[in-house]
């Protein structure tokens, strides 16, 4: 499992992370991990019309890690992760006035990923039950960038409003950055 390359797709809400993750997985004929937070928070919203609270963050992070561990067992050379714990950390700090559980930071440093794609905000924001910050996407982009810089990880930024061009850009970056041997 340590030979499997882990690539994280991250960025603010409504930047095409889930679509990018699935498209990259299809392009590279590989497995992917869904965003645990989306399913968890959608269920919370559907059941009680409540949004994410500080108390949810550890469950979200642990759920994401568990999903990754399950999916990697059925993967060969490459796996794409629709967000990871660094996303939860950035979100926590931004939405809860700098608050984060120390476990999030320690795990974000402990867990190793081979490469990150940070999706920029230059695509149209699309509303849904869980998206609530159309005017904070640039702030969230910078929060994600801060976490990636702080972790000193290898990443590139995906830009542009055309989703096909963004996908081609991502494929090119991955081919240049990941050793497939």
Question: Predicted segments — roles?
Answer:
Residues 17:
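Conserved lysine of the Walker
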Residues 13:
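The conserved Walker
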Residues 9:
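Hydrophobic anchor at the beta1->P-loop junction of P-loop NTPases
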Residues 22, 26-65:
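Conserved substrate/cofactor phosphate-moiety recognition/catalytic segment
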Residues 48-97:
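Conserved nucleotide-sensing/catalytic segment adjacent to the nucleotide-binding pocket
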Residues 95-164, 172, 178:
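A glycine- and Lys/Arg-enriched "phosphate-lid" helix/loop adjacent to the NTP-binding pocket
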Residues 1-4:
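Phosphate-binding P-loop
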């Amino acid at each position: 499992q340590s030979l499997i390359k882990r690539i994280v797709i991250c960025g603010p809400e409504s930047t095409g992370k889930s679509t990018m993750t699935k498209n990259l997985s299809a392009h590279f004929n590989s497995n992917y991990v869904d965003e645990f937070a989306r399913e968890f928070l959608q269920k919370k919203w559907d059941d009680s019309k409540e949004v994410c609270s500080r108390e949810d963050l550890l469950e979200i992070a642990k759920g994401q890690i568990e999903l990754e561990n399950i999916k990697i067992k059925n993967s060969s050379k490459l796996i794409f992760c629709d967000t990871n714990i660094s996303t939860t950390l950035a979100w926590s700090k931004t939405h809860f006035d700098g608050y984060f559980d120390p476990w999030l930071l320690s795990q974000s440093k402990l867990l190793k990923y081979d490469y990150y794609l940070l999706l920029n905000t230059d695509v149209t924001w699309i509303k849904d039950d869980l998206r609530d910050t159309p005017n904070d996407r640039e702030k969230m982009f910078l929060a994600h960038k801060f976490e990636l810089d702080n972790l000193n990880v290898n990443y590139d930024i995906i830009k542009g409003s055309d989703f096909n061009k963004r996908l081609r850009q991502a494929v090119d970056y991955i081919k240049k950055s990941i050793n497939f041997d």
